[in-house]
């Protein structure tokens, strides 16, 4: 056993200078690529981190849709179900009078707290809830894809099939693809009833974003049962289920509703010619996002908007 002095005198570490040069080049590239990154904490290599790191946005279509409602009178409140590390709230939440975030994953919740403080200040008034909403009060196991913190889901009571849950994150071998945590779930109807009764004034107009990987129906039904008739909302939510019954969804709400799918119209060319796309882009071609009203026979998979 060496003593401390012997260890100090014997210490030596060598490295490959070629590897050092490669690393320095990568660091320069990283600094260049991330010069417009969002001022938030994200996890390197995670599926939800690429856009915030590279150009400071997350889901541009969703953020712009929320902004469109916020700047046109729907700015009284924002409810963010499945807030994760706070990307939607932090990048689209400025301008709402009240913000309520819900995130059951305790690991992610700590990052959410930090990102909210970075964005809204230490003395922020954003309400952060370290629990999710479902069909009752319980402790459930959260399944977390190792390469996508944003894809975590509750298997118990999930409305998605196992194939959908695997496919949405491109999981081929589930045996080593996930981590697991026990999380707190509270009854959707009870909690939302209290929220709309005591914390959101009557007559308010706001935005609700739901990204809870197969638990959306529980929250949507609870909103329908508890939303005051004087309030109006734009509900943005994700759907991976091709058999999603939006007619049943509309029946939850005892009032007029309209359902849309957010669709991307990118710049295209014949035969997917990349050079032609570059030329068109240099000449000013622009891609677009638009809302298409959903009919009975249309594919409901994608980012949806329910106007109530």
Where are each of the predicted segments found?
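S-adenosyl-L-methionine
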Residues: 1-125, 165-182, 189, 193-204, ...
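Polar, low-complexity loop segments and adjacent catalytic/binding residues used for recognizing
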Residues: 139-147, 156
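A short alpha/beta connector and helix-capping loop motif
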Residues: 89, 96-97, 206-207, 216-243, ...
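C-terminal substrate-binding/active-site "lid" region of AdoMet-derived donor-dependent transferases
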Residues: 244-257, 261-266
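Conserved residues in the N-terminal Rossmann fold of short-chain dehydrogenase/reductase
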Residues: 130-131, 182-185, 209
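Conserved S-adenosyl-L-methionine
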Residues: 82, 209-213
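Short alpha-helical
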Residues: 61, 87, 106-107, 149, ...
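Hydrophobic pocket-lining residues within nucleotide cofactor-binding pockets
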Residues: 133-135, 188, 212, 239
């Amino acid at each position: 056993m060496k003593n401390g002095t012997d260890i100090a005198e014997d210490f030596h570490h060598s490295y490959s200078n070629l590897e050092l040069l490669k690393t320095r080049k990568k660091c320069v590239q990283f600094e260049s690529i991330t010069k417009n990154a969002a001022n938030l904490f994200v996890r390197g290599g995670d599926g939800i981190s690429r856009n915030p790191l590279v150009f400071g946005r997350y889901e541009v279509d969703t953020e712009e849709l929320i902004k469109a409602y916020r700047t046109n009178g729907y700015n009284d409140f924002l409810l963010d179900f499945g807030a994760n590390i706070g990307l939607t709230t932090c990048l689209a939440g400025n301008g709402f009078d009240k913000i309520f975030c819900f995130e059951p994953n305790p690991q992610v919740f700590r990052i959410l707290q930090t990102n909210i403080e970075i964005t809204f200040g230490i003395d922020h008034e954003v309400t952060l809830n370290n629990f999710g909403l479902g069909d009752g009060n319980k402790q459930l196991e959260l399944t977390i894809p190792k390469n996508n913190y944003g894809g975590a889901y509750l298997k118990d009571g999930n409305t998605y099939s196992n194939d959908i849950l695997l496919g949405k994150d491109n999981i081929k071998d589930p045996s080593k693809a996930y981590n697991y945590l026990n999380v707190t779930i509270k009854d959707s109807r009870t909690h939302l009833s209290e929220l709309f009764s005591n914390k959101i004034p009557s007559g308010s107009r706001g935005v609700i974003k739901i990204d809870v990987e197969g638990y959306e129906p529980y929250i949507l039904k609870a909103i329908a049962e508890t939303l005051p008739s004087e309030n109006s909302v734009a509900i943005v939510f994700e759907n991976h289920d091709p058999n999603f019954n939006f007619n049943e969804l509309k029946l939850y709400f005892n009032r007029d509703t309209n359902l849309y799918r957010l669709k991307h119209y990118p710049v295209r060319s014949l035969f997917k010619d990349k050079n032609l796309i570059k030329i068109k882009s240099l000449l000013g071609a622009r891609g677009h996002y638009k809302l298409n009203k959903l009919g009975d026979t249309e594919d409901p998979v994608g980012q949806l908007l329910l106007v109530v």
